[in-house]
Amino acid sequence: MVIAFIPVRGGSKSIPLKNIKPFCGKPLVCWNIEALEQCKEVDEIIVATDSDKIEETVVSQAYKKTKVYHRLAENACDTASTESVMLEYIRYTQLAEDDIFMLVQATSPLTETLHFTEALDMYSKGEYDSILTCVRNYRFFWNEDGTSMNYDYENRPRRQNFSGMLMENGAFYINKVGNILESGNRLSGHIG
């Protein structure tokens, strides 16, 4: 079973209820839900929230695979980690250890069905214990002490010869439930 899990708090301090603010004509969280609804590999989509307004927004769309999970208040506060609500849900629902758990961030609305499909296909090959999404960054980075992090400044590479670095973009993560329970983390083992 493949579960897509979208944690969305109502109490964001920077932008209250940001996950249901209109973004290009629809609530922000709906972009990922709709992409996941079209992904044939995903069996169930869980929106974990503490907000009645977010729940109303999601339920009003009448999605077929999507359900709302009411997360505990202690796992919806500013100091709670995403892992805390993931573990809460996994333990509450007693998911099987071999179920595939895909953490999806509502704040990455440009993620398309194809991205989910390709990543789940990659994961199904068994080469990796967990997977994360990245973008390739072609910038040169420095430490505050004046040392370069990812290149030799005395032999500065031409852009065409610089492979850059992969930067985690946080769009989504894939792991097995058993790995998450064992590590307490969205990523574990051999990461792809």
Question: How would you describe each model-predicted region?
Answer:
Residues 1, 43-45, 100, 129:
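Residues at the starts of beta-strands that form the adenosine-phosphate
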Residues 28-44, 56-57:
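A short, N-terminal amphipathic alpha-helix
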Residues 78-88, 97, 108-192:
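Conserved core of the sugar-phosphate nucleotidyltransferase
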Residues 46, 52-102, 111-114, 118:
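Short phosphate-binding loop-to-helix
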Residues 44-49, 133-134:
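Short internal beta-strands
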Residues 1-16:
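N-terminal nucleotide-binding beta1-loop-alpha1 segment
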Residues 7-9, 103-105, 133-135:
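Short beta-strand segments
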